[in-house]
């Protein structure tokens, strides 16, 4: 049995979770699985599983790649020689959402740190970012119960000024995160995954930021949208 979790996993143990599934930390998964199902269990970070699935039969097939997953938070993973990087403690490549991208106006992240990418581009952060904009009450976003990527992109499509300013902030943050991953892990391909990546406007803006700011003397990293965002995690969990 295989399970993907939005947590830091090291040697079959969940060692850290940020806000969700806190009872998974230190839980004896092996004992539980044997007792409940009579079978061993394999645990994996969800972004790492998604990247592995895309490398097996998706947008990163036969390449060294990194992934940035945009959802409630921001997940990431990286691979070298077709193997997921984990490091000594399981965190290598997994904390892209918590790379610091902002110093002058640092926002508090759910992890407790300030300036994290996730605090500027995770779905959970969008509502607060939008409501702090001048003119929010008169903007298209004011009609949303809670501002998320769908509401933001709808506002952008309407030409709403506040939506456009928030979009620029968020897209720039994602571009910074992409550059950080490229500089850190030297991938041939950078995958972007998650519902917001279906926006061609967002993808263009991220690609432009990367093109203008990345330093890769060997050439340009190929930035792609995940082919199978709904199924790549399952494909990555298949044990060979």
Feature map (PLM): residue ranges:
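A structural motif shared across PLP-dependent enzymes of the aminotransferase-like
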Residues: 22-30
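Glycine-rich phosphate-binding loop of actin/hexokinase-like ATP-binding domains
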Residues: 63-120
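Short glycine-enriched, charge-decorated loop/helix-capping segments at active-site entrances
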Residues: 15-22
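ATP-binding/phosphotransfer module of carbohydrate and carboxylate kinases, centering on a glycine-rich
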Residues: 1, 9-14, 31, 35-39, ...
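A secondary-structure boundary/capping signal
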Residues: 4-5, 17, 70
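General beta-strand structural signal in soluble alpha/beta enzymes
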Residues: 41-45
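Short acidic loop-to-helix transition motifs that present clustered carboxylates
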Residues: 48-51
